[in-house]
Amino acid sequence: MSVDTYTETTKIDKLLKKPTSHFQLSTTQLYNKILDNNEGVLTELGAVNASTGKYTGRSPKDKFFVSEPSYRDNIDWGEINQPIDEETFLKLYHKVLDYLDKKDELYVFKGYAGSDKDTMLKLTVINELAWHNLFAKNMFIRPESKEEATKIKPNFTIVSAPHFKADPEVDGTKSETFVIISFKHKVILIGGTEYAGEMKKGIFSVMNYLLPMQDIMSMHCSANVGEKGDVALFFGLSGTGKTTLSADPHRKLIGDDEHGWNKNGVFNIEGGCYAKAINLSKEKEPQIFDAIKYGAILENTVVAEDGSVDFEDNRYTENTRAAYPINHIDNIVVPSKAAHPNTIIFLTADAFGVIPPISKLNKDQAMYHFLSGFTSKLAGTERGVTEPEPSFSTCFGAPFFPLHPTVYADLLGELIDLHDVDVYLVNTGWTGGKYGVGRRISLHYTRQMVNQAISGKLKNAEYTKDSTFGLSIPVEIEDVPKTILNPINAWSDKEKYKTQAEDLIQRFEKNFEKFGEKVEHIAEKGSFNK
């Protein structure tokens, strides 16, 4: 099969110009399509609920980057960033375009990624499903008008065909599912999965390649700003509390998941929020709950015949989600950018129950923990994970970072130094014992610790260095029991704590070996007990 760029462009143009390709539909128009096509149901909250079928999380083993001459030397190839050759990609790409050409209806959205005008990525999103198009409209940055959208000449195109199933033997994939990113052809090709999060994380992966090439830090974090203009960043993997902790009624939200940090400060990459919805309640998370209204999408929640939503029901997945435009939250920064950060919070959900609830890191420790990215995989964010497992995810988001980790770590270290940023490690996981024995650290206490940190009250507080990890733990924090600040005190069996802690330290050391000599200086100064 012979393919070329001309044919590819012609096919895309043909799809866009089809009479039944619906361009830049309003939320109401998309709602009508979703309901008419039986793609979702209307809930009493006003949001639509859609099912993603058997794929209720990302499929990281089915994600590939096309190995192309101008880009291949920059990508950190391995289990996460898997290569696929250009010819294989193009054959599959054209099969998908031909498949979409035969569909009765398609949905097209044009918008942006990145709220910084200098590095903004112009996007076209072509969807097989109406609810996926509403997802794109909610999650990416929306043009001011349909007229503006018509003038967008995309830097990148998402082609999403969830009902197209690949044949691994013929198409060179690992399963029926595929997420393929080509920097040369400027396309993200998605098929075989209805999980809408693949679109947003695909563009995030693209930005994580493009921004550092311009000496701009890209980050898997949430961000907010206080009344005095003080900015806080929250790093962490899905389920560690980024969205929850940054949705603070006393601080304005910059964004909940993906950001850049350039010479002017911090900017949001997205135009929406993608919050975990399991066990969501108005009492615990009022901002998120109130954002789930007309225009929002719920994924895989259980909806009764009367339209009521049971957020506690996990029969389909633990990874239930809500996708809504950022302006569904009242106190946001417009546009979604702010000054340089004063405080960085690294969030981890420690299933061992030995990491302190909060500790202050020096720059070397910050680099070490950023590269380590320790947390526990929480149920539902990836297929096959049903209970927490300890894991290391470089940069607190390894699945989304195509360049070598030291590229991001070096940028972060330079920025911490340049702007005198305070960095804290916060454990939102377990205390008093490992998962199954101990208990989850109270969200109330975590909020109190985080609030004290970002207010600057912990900057010059009294600290004690714990004997196990060598971390600096605050001696006291207002309205937080002293007994939980040093984790050994929360364990009834101190010897079991020491055994568990030593096991974790060894896991950190073993994990860090993969970085080799490039990061020896960070390991020497930043690792535990240094």
Curated annotation (Swiss-Prot):
Protein's pathway: Carbohydrate biosynthesis; gluconeogenesis
InterPro entries: PEP_carboxykinase_ATP, PEP_carboxykinase_C, PEP_carboxykinase_N, PEPCK_ATP_CS
Chief location bin: cytoplasm
EC number from the UniProt entry: 4.1.1.49
Alphabetized UniProt keyword annotations: ATP-binding, Cytoplasm, Decarboxylase, Gluconeogenesis, Lyase, Manganese, Metal-binding, Nucleotide-binding
Residues annotated as binding ATP: 201, 220, 236-244, 285, 321, 440-441, 446
Keyword Cytoplasm among UniProt keywords: yes
Function: Involved in the gluconeogenesis. Catalyzes the conversion of oxaloacetate (OAA) to phosphoenolpyruvate (PEP) through direct phosphoryl transfer between the nucleoside triphosphate and OAA.
Protein's UniProt name: Phosphoenolpyruvate carboxykinase (ATP)
Species of the source: Staphylococcus aureus (strain MRSA252)
Gene giving rise to this polypeptide: pckA
